[in-house]
Regions:
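Basic, ligand-binding patches in group-transfer machinery
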Residues: 1-118
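Class I (Rossmann-like) S-adenosyl-L-methionine-dependent methyltransferase catalytic domain
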Residues: 113-150, 166-173, 180-230, 271-360
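Short glycine-centered segments of the SAM/dcSAM-binding site in methyltransferase folds
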Residues: 158, 270-271
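A conserved beta-strand element that flanks and buttresses the S-adenosyl-L-methionine
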Residues: 242
């Protein structure tokens, strides 16, 4: 598995971005995960490139301390101040995406993106910890960048968020999607859905539903089996769907049903980004060598591997051939797999393995 034909693997964080006094000010860090180092950062506002804006990086011992396994983290910080004119400020005010793209040699990497200003309230750290932790805003916009990069997500699309939680992925979408778009999210936690509804109250085209689905970890009193759940949407309703950190907590029958349902509600040509813990040779090697953040050592009768027999839904992995078979049986085409960092890989897109699926 490797990067896409049009980009290379890079990894970084946009710590802060502000637009004031006629300039864009941005701070963050980024490293190359490939053979070539990052040589420059290029700025774009919407579809309009603004050119190269940065070529020198600053010492970053703080990054190296947190990410010692990544190459180049000792000298990867950037601090930008870019003058913007009236037309550029107009595009920013109309919620055009501000992208800072690292370039390694002649290949672009994964963009660092924001929309300014933010108009929705972000979750506080205590609430965000309940859905995986991390910086709520940064994680949301990092996935918006992937949705745009991998699936070409447009601003006017109909979007399904299977497993929406408190609306972490929806947060960036709430700034990106326009009034003609439609967002639908569902989650098995009534408390999470209530929180999301409150946060997105200003957006009438964003809808959140509670699905009372049984899960031993997250909804032990649920009335519906995930393997029997029918998504509450009409056939061919969406152009884009995603399920992040959903299949990583699901047993085989549940995975099969959700894949079939995703196919049912997607229009022909519709795309889906789904994340998994996929066991290929490199992942198995990482587990055996102790490099992996998760040790999938317990095999269940349905063929999946888990980290805990007592709480199997805490983290679930599947052999990659099994995932490919389930995807094909659901009537979806697997376009590409981008590896995750979880088993200690040196080249990755994000933490979990990212699958791009298409309904043909």
């Amino acid at each position: 598995m490797g990067a896409g034909e049009n980009f290379c693997y890079t990894f970084g964080v946009l710590d802060a971005l502000d637009v004031s006094g006629g300039r864009i000010v941005a701070h963050g860090w980024v490293v190359s995960l490939g053979e070539h180092p990052i040589t420059e950062l290029r700025l774009a506002i919407g579809d309009a490139p603004e050119g190269s804006v940065h070529r020198e990086f600053l010492p970053s011992p703080d990054v190296a301390k947190v990410w010692p396994q990544l190459p180049g983290t000792g000298h990867c910080r950037f601090s930008l101040q870019v003058e913007v004119g009236e037309e550029q400020r107009r595009r920013i005010a109309s919620r055009e995406v501000i992208s800072i793209t690292p370039w390694a040699g002649d290949m672009p990497g994964v963009p660092l993106e924001r929309i300014f200003p933010l108009s929705l309230g972000a979750a506080q750290a205590q609430e965000s910890c309940q859905v995986g932790g991390g910086d709520f805003v940064e994680i949301s916009f990092s996935f918006l960048a992937l949705f745009r990069l991998l699936a070409g997500l447009r601003r006017d699309e109909s979007v399904l968020d299977a497993g929406c939680g408190i609306g972490r992925m929806a947060f960036a979408l709430g700034h990106y999607l326009d009034a003609q778009a439609r967002y639908e999210g569902f989650d098995i936690s009534d408390r999470f859905v209530t929180s999301a509804r409150e946060r997105f109250r200003p957006l009438p085209n964003f809808h959140f539903r509670h699905a009372d689905i049984f899960n031993r970890m997250y909804n032990p009193k649920g009335a519906i089996r995930a393997a029997d759940f029918r998504f509450p949407y009409e056939d061919r309703s969406f152009g884009f769907a995603f399920a992040t950190s959903v299949f990583t907590h699901m047993l085989r029958g549940d995975v099969r049903n959700y894949l079939r349902e995703i196919r049912r509600v997607l229009r022909p040509g519709g795309r889906c980004i789904a994340t998994f813990f996929s066991l290929d040779a490199e992942a198995r090697s990482g587990i055996e060598a102790g490099r992996s953040t998760l040790a999938f050592r317990h095999k269940l009768p349905d063929g999946c591997l888990v980290t805990s027999r007592r709480a199997p839904e805490a983290a679930i992995a599947y052999p990659e051939p099994d995932l490919r078979q389930m995807i094909a049986e659901a009537g979806l085409a697997l376009e590409v797999v981008h590896p995750g960092s979880w088993p200690g890989r040196e080249r990755f897109l994000t933490y979990q393995d990212v699958f791009l699926l298409v309904r043909e």
